[in-house]
Amino acid sequence: MSENTVMPIVRVAVLAAGDDGGRLTEMALPSELPLREILPAVQRIVQPARENDGAADPAAAPNPVRLSLAPIGGAPFSLDATLDTVGVVDGDLLALQAVPSGPPAPRIVEDIADAAVIFSEARRRQWGPTHIARGAALALIGLILVGTGLSVAHRVITGDLLGQFIVSGIALATVIAALAVRNRSAVLATSLAVTALVPVAAAFALGVPGDFGAPNVLLAAAGVAAWSLISMAGSPDDRGIAVFTATAVTGVGVLLVAGAASLWVISSDVIGCALVLLGLIVTVQAAQLSAMWARFPLPVIPAPGDPTPAARPLSVLADLPRRVRVSQAHQTGVIAAGVLLGVAGSVALVSSANASPWAWYIVVAAAAGAALRARVWDSAACKAWLLGHSYLLAVALLVAFVIGDRYQAALWALAALAVLVLVWIVAALNPKIASPDTYSLPMRRMVGFLATGLDASLIPVMALLVGLFSLVLDR
């Protein structure tokens, strides 16, 4: 048997319409290849580019016309069919015509095995330039993170300034790259901008000489907040706006507390209470802050007797859907920042071995208040962050206790985490328990009163814990 396989062919005549009445071309075409693969060559043969009018490849046009072969007076063949499948034989006359707009015709298969392969998800999502670009972006992000980690470790362990210079260069290069690709690829720009938060924070934190302390945290928080505000102003992606809002608000909160710790000597109780209080304020004011950042047009309500104000321009009304999306993204970011500040403050309050019982009350009340506050929000992202407050806190305390060699406390944190998971499982098996509509009106009022009482009790307990009452009484 010969080593070369002979490809079956069919000899046909192809008619292509044109201004001069059409052009008939005889050609030999492979009969077992899909039309999708042979049509580009057929199109180049029967419709050559004209020299005078500079016509280019129709596939390169802004809205290319999809062409296919068809019998004279018949419907175009499916692009996934072969000439053998549709019954084309030697001597047939075919026409090259446009595929009508609308949903594509069902693919033609010859047996069940072919159908299983053709209609599988793996065949529909084959490897292509998009996957290559995505892999390159992931590789670049991984390189940035690995380089940042290595530089920080080198600076901390050896004390050499080389690590500081390298991490500063990585931060600068990442920031420039994120700004450079903003107009070309919004997704890549957002990914690089989010990744740049890590080297920026590391570069600013390592910029303060001496032992690590409040000044390092102050400078790192300032860098993160500044870069977040810059990225948030130019981010076209709603998810990017939410992320940068969360990092900006968290950075500003940590900046205020770290600034106070740099100026005065304050205890961990004061730091924790300040972070929890900032998180509570941010969460309560999330709706107002998000509306302000989205720049909603303020309503003009005339006084009695005043003339009716003019209607809003159509451009403002047409821009309202975009502003609503931006407001929702800001709202999600503000809620996330409030949860992160509350968790950080709770860890600062009870991570030490001699934590006060009042500190534990603040931690539990803040977590319970966040869970009860989730009933107010309709957004799934906001609910997820508020309900995840307790889980983030349990995991953070578990890690802190293990690092501090407090394994008994870590077991208690693990038990609390198991109880929280059990609550989720019960709610998943009985959805009515987690639905507020199934509760009576008196029960809803009781839950609202409990949530208000927990929030109102936090500030007096914080004042008692930090010694404000003792300071006033001693004077």
From Swiss-Prot:
The keyword Membrane applies. Disruption phenotype: Deletion of the gene impairs iron-bound mycobactin utilization and EsxG and EsxH export. Pfam families: YukD (PF08817). It is a multi-pass membrane protein. It comes from the Bacteria. The keyword Chaperone does not apply. Keywords: Cell inner membrane, Cell membrane, Membrane, Transmembrane, Transmembrane helix, Transport. The chain crosses the membrane at residues 132-152, 161-181, 186-206, 212-232, 241-261, 264-284, 333-353, 354-374, 384-404, 409-429, 453-473. Its main location: membrane. One of its GO terms (cellular component) is plasma membrane. It is found in: Cell inner membrane. Part of the ESX-3 specialized secretion system, which is required for siderophore-mediated iron acquisition and for the secretion of EsxH and EsxG. Belongs to the EccD/Snm4 family. Part of the ESX-3 / type VII secretion system (T7SS), which is composed of cytosolic and membrane components. The ESX-3 membrane complex is composed of EccB3, EccC3, EccD3 and EccE3. This is ESX-3 secretion system protein EccD3. It comes from Mycolicibacterium smegmatis (strain ATCC 700084 / mc(2)155) (Mycobacterium smegmatis). The lineage of its organism: Bacteria, Bacillati, Actinomycetota, Actinomycetes, Mycobacteriales. The gene is eccD3.
